[in-house]
Amino acid sequence: MEKYGKDFKYEDFIPMWKAENWDPKQWAEIFKEAGAEYVVLTTKHHDGFCLFPSKYTHFNSVEMGPKRNITGELTEAVRDAGIRMGLYYSGLIDWQYANDPIFEDDDLFGTASPTFAYADYSYNQMKELVDDYAPSVFWNDIGWPTQSEEMMPYFLAHYYNKVPEGVVNDRFNDRYHDFLTKEYKSGSVNRKEKWEMCRGMGLSFGYNANEGDDKLISVPDLISLLVGTVANNGNLLLNIGPKQTEQFRKTGKEAEDSWRMAES
């Protein structure tokens, strides 16, 4: 309110985003140096803004904001670096289709898949991502719209036909998965099944300018988390949300350097 005023809308941020400093090749080099086996990009989160061109919405980074296909550019750079590319998609929640305000955590799920129109939209966009980018990992979030539950097998069949070696996570309404996910959680795991630990560098997945370095996971704790995860047949998916300058926090680079030294 103090900085932008009461009439400023979420969508008003989009023209301010130019992505002038974004270099997908540099990102891919950092991922490769860190020893990443795969990368997962958030193509659309709960706000509904897409980082790829879509036949189903103008609310995307090619027609608005930076006027760039973030998904396509990073996919090409990551694959050129010899790393598998995965895509995240918020399948059940899209606030462009919801009108109810969110005051607490429970309200978040009250906005999930509010209409049949959104269920169709979500299905079509998921297929669009598979057709255009053939991701090695399809990371669906929250769940699958119940209004189009019968379309889930068709989507999964389409994905595996397009990407025979591809894998999907466990957020397809518990009906099918190639690996389980744990998000900011610890505790016992089933070592007989493949799983993935997912968390951010700090307390949030996106970059938070008000989140100080004291809130970030320390280098020793990060290495301990990685070793413990891999030793229990899991993978670590570490979210490293960039700053508004498209650059990573210094701490993220320090963790990468420390891990390389620990390997040598």
Give the role of each language-model region:
Residues 1-264:
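Mature catalytic domains of secreted/periplasmic carbohydrate-active enzymes
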